[in-house]
């Protein structure tokens, strides 16, 4: 039995249930094969993903199951037999985009009645969203949430033969499903989920409500997946979780994320290890030492601080102060001097004053992040912050946001300037999206580097001398 699962059987989907889902996969594969024989064309799907890396990885699982069913992927919605939107509800803008896409699909559905339209992901965990879609977008065939992804074959089979919208959304925490097919595209980098859910309940965040409470995969299952990726030729893995630093706490046998990192570091074939996301309150000394001591762990840490004001951090329920965060960063830099730090920042949280915002700018100057993902505060229905008084006016948010961007852009460029003339190790990931003669990759510190190369170097580690620096990327030439 896998480590840590003895008392946690109920959080795993049973082998019998997974076998039952496989039968639906086989049924759909047979139907698609008959259609292919008749028409000479494979059935096509178009999968659109919104949101975080967890959603991206969920979409890889959907793609893996669809490949087993005999579908081929297309970017062209108009030629698709199946359209899926994997949704995000962290920001309002992502939700509005989904509604826009669904509205545009109605004429296509009228032209192609057999087209199956599916919507899944975090948005669907909100009952009011499901009701809105059923009422306003009745041409949608299938709605399911985050907790029953493994049931997609059964749900798709039902939707293909239903005259009404099939809805299957669970309000429980969900179970862990092992051995779901995964379609990873580039063959160089891979995401590996180590845990699901979040227990932190930050007052602005909808994630604990739509992803459930924390559930850790067993270490044995994770290590076996990473070993398989090493055998398949993947060079870099990113360990995923809403809060990876909490990994193992629910297992109850002392298993920790630092221990997992040390075990993953031993696996042959894997050259680089990354992880995301880390909560400052849970980042232990042991994890810092593991990052320092494990040669495959990249010198990059994404450590969201969200706001610089201790008063606002308390309102956010972040459970650390401004001083706590600065002291933690000092400890990290003491042990890993060349660490590249990135972060998340929310501007305009309810009650934020100019003095509070000045604390945010102060952290930028003191820590000097390589990059920051910055957001205007967005009300999320069902979160405590949405009900808070003293909401910050939009024009004030936008003015502060602009100052934040200007400050961070300057710091990012100043940091990148220090790379001019240096030789850096780069993992070659593929061809640039804008120039097929230019290849792109990342340093251990997660800097994007563009350079001339050839396809034979994809998946290889090369040394690149930096000749040009920009705010968000570097350019150079391979040192032969």
Curated annotation (Swiss-Prot):
All copies of domain Radical SAM core, residue ranges: 184-414
Compartment(s): Cytoplasm
Any matching Pfam family: UPF0004
Residue ranges annotated for the MTTase N-terminal domain, each copy included: 43-161
Gene Ontology molecular function terms on file: 4 iron, 4 sulfur cluster binding; metal ion binding; N6-isopentenyladenosine methylthiotransferase activity
SMART domains assigned: Elp3
Main location (coarse class): cytoplasm
Cofactor(s) of this protein: [4Fe-4S] cluster
Binding site for [4Fe-4S] cluster 1: 52, 88, 122
The keyword Nuclease appears for this protein: no
Gene Ontology annotations for the cellular component aspect, listed alphabetically: cytosol
Coiled-coil annotated residue ranges, if any: none
EC numbers for this chain: 2.8.4.3
Domain TRAM: 417-480
Binding residue positions for [4Fe-4S] cluster 2: 198, 202, 205
Reaction equation(s) it catalyzes: N(6)-dimethylallyladenosine(37) in tRNA + (sulfur carrier)-SH + AH2 + 2 S-adenosyl-L-methionine = 2-methylsulfanyl-N(6)-dimethylallyladenosine(37) in tRNA + (sulfur carrier)-H + 5'-deoxyadenosine + L-methionine + A + S-adenosyl-L-homocysteine + 2 H(+)
CDD domains: Radical_SAM (cd01335)
Alphabetized UniProt keyword annotations: 4Fe-4S, Cytoplasm, Iron, Iron-sulfur, Metal-binding, S-adenosyl-L-methionine, Transferase, tRNA processing
Family statement: Belongs to the methylthiotransferase family. MiaB subfamily.
Job description of the protein: Catalyzes the methylthiolation of N6-(dimethylallyl)adenosine (i(6)A), leading to the formation of 2-methylthio-N6-(dimethylallyl)adenosine (ms(2)i(6)A) at position 37 in tRNAs that read codons beginning with uridine.
PANTHER family with a match to the protein in the record: CDK5 REGULATORY SUBUNIT-ASSOCIATED PROTEIN 1, MITOCHONDRIAL TRNA METHYLTHIOTRANSFERASE CDK5RAP1
Protein name per Swiss-Prot or TrEMBL: tRNA-2-methylthio-N(6)-dimethylallyladenosine synthase
Source organism (scientific name): Acetivibrio thermocellus (strain ATCC 27405 / DSM 1237 / JCM 9322 / NBRC 103400 / NCIMB 10682 / NRRL B-4536 / VPI 7372) (Clostridium thermocellum)
Upper taxonomic lineage: Bacteria, Bacillati, Bacillota, Clostridia, Eubacteriales
């Amino acid at each position: 039995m896998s480590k840590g699962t003895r008392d946690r059987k109920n959080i795993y989907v049973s082998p019998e249930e997974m076998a039952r889902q496989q039968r639906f996969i086989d049924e759909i594969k047979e139907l698609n094969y008959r259609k292919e024989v008749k028409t000479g064309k494979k059935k096509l799907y178009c999968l659109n993903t919104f949101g975080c890396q967890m959603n991206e990885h969920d979409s890889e699982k959907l793609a893996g199951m669809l490949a087993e069913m005999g579908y081929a992927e297309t970017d062209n919605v108009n030629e698709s037999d199946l359209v899926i939107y994997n949704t995000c509800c962290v920001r309002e803008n992502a939700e509005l985009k989904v509604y826009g896409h669904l509205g545009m699909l109605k004429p296509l559905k009228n032209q192609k009645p057999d087209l199956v339209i599916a919507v899944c992901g975090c948005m669907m965990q909100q009952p009011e969203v499901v009701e809105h879609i059923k009422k306003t977008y009745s041409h949608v065939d299938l709605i399911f949430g985050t907790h029953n992804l493994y049931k997609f074959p059964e749900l798709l089979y039902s939707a293909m033969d239903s005259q009404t919208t099939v809805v299957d959304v669970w309000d429980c925490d969900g179970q862990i499903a092992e051995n779901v097919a995964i379609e990873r595209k580039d063959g160089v980098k891979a995401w590996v989920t180590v845990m699901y859910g979040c227990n932190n309940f930050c007052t602005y965040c909808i994630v604990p409500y739509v992803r459930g409470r924390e559930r850790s995969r067993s270490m044995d299952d994770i290590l076996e997946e990473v070993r398989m990726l090493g055998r398949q030729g993947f060079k870099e893995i990113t360990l995923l979780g809403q809060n990876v630093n909490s990994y193992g706490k629910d297992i109850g046998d002392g298993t920790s994320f630092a221990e997992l990192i040390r075990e993953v570091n031993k696996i042959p074939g894997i050259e680089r290890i990354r992880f995301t996301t880390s909560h400052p309150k849970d980042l232990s000394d042991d994890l810092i030492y593991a990052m320092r001591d494990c040669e495959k762990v990249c010198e990059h840490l994404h450590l969201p601080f969200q706001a610089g004001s201790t008063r606002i951090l308390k309102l956010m329920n972040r459970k650390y102060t401004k001083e706590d965060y600065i002291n933690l960063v000092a400890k990290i830099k003491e042990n890993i001097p060349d660490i590249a730090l990135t972060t998340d920042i929310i501007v305009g949280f309810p009650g934020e004053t100019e003095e509070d915002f000045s604390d945010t700018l102060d952290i930028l100057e003191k820590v000097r992040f390589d990059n920051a993902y910055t957001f205007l505060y967005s009300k999320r229905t069902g979160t405590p912050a949405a009900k808070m008084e003293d909401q910050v006016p939009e024009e004030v948010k936008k003015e502060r946001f602009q100052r934040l961007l200007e400050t961070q852009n300057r710091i990012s460029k100043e940091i990148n300037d220090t790379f001019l003339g240096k030789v850096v190790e780069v993992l070659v990931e593929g061809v640039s999206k804008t120039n097929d003669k230019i290849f792109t990759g990342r340093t251990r510190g997660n800097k994007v580097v563009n350079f001339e190369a050839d396809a034979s170097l994809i998946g290889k580690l090369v040394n690149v001398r930096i000749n040009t620096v920009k705010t968000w990327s570097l350019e150079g030439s391979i040192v032969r």
